[in-house]
Amino acid sequence: MLEKILIGVAGVLVLFVAVVATRPSAYHVERKLEVAAPADLVFGVLNDLHQFAGVLVLFGSPWEKLDPNMQKTFEGPAAGVGQSYAWSGKEVGKGKMTIEESVPGQKVGMKLEFVEPMESTATCALTLAGTPTGSFVTWSMDGNHNFIGKAFGMFVNMDKMLGTDIEKGLALLKTVAEGR
């Protein structure tokens, strides 16, 4: 009897591993929002991580609320390509974002490096398009899951989880840009 139970458990584990292994590793999450501010103004906030991080701090970032004692450091130029922002905290883990692409008034591309609690990297693009009343901001995030990430994705909707954070970030950006 015990032997049959162990064989059954082993079979379920093998099936689970096989299903996880066949799941796609790449993910893409994207959200858009119209902002009643010109693209150049919005670009200025995004292209300077001091301002971008400041936006999150001043206007109630969910990450700042989660870990108000996290340590933050900035490196590189005053703005644009090469500027980086690193964070470290008990609740938010450890990571770094670096601007890798900067097209004035159009796009800021960043590399995100998550070190703790789970190591991974992702790319983030904030694309701007002018509209008659301001600008349209598209925030996308792309990355690849390792095996554990793919297993986690079977139980958690990554688009919803990451998308909710992106939506909050866009709402904060809108508040700041429209207030300038």
Give a label for each model feature.
Residues 34, 44, 87, 91, ...:
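Extracytoplasmic/periplasmic, Sec-exported soluble proteins
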Residues 4-76:
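Hydrophobic ligand-binding cavity/cleft-lining segments
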Residues 45-55, 129-131, 176-180:
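Structured segments of extracytoplasmic/periplasmic soluble domains
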Residues 2-23, 79-136:
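Hydrophobic-ligand binding "helix-grip"
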Residues 31, 37-39, 74, 78, ...:
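Solvent-exposed, flexible loop/coil residues
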Residues 39, 43-52, 82, 96, ...:
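Extracytoplasmic/secreted envelope proteins and their assembly/folding machinery
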Residues 62-68, 170-180:
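Short, highly charged C-terminal tails/helix-capping segments
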Residues 98-101, 111-164, 173-175, 179:
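Beta-strand/loop substructures that line and gate deep hydrophobic ligand-binding cavities in soluble
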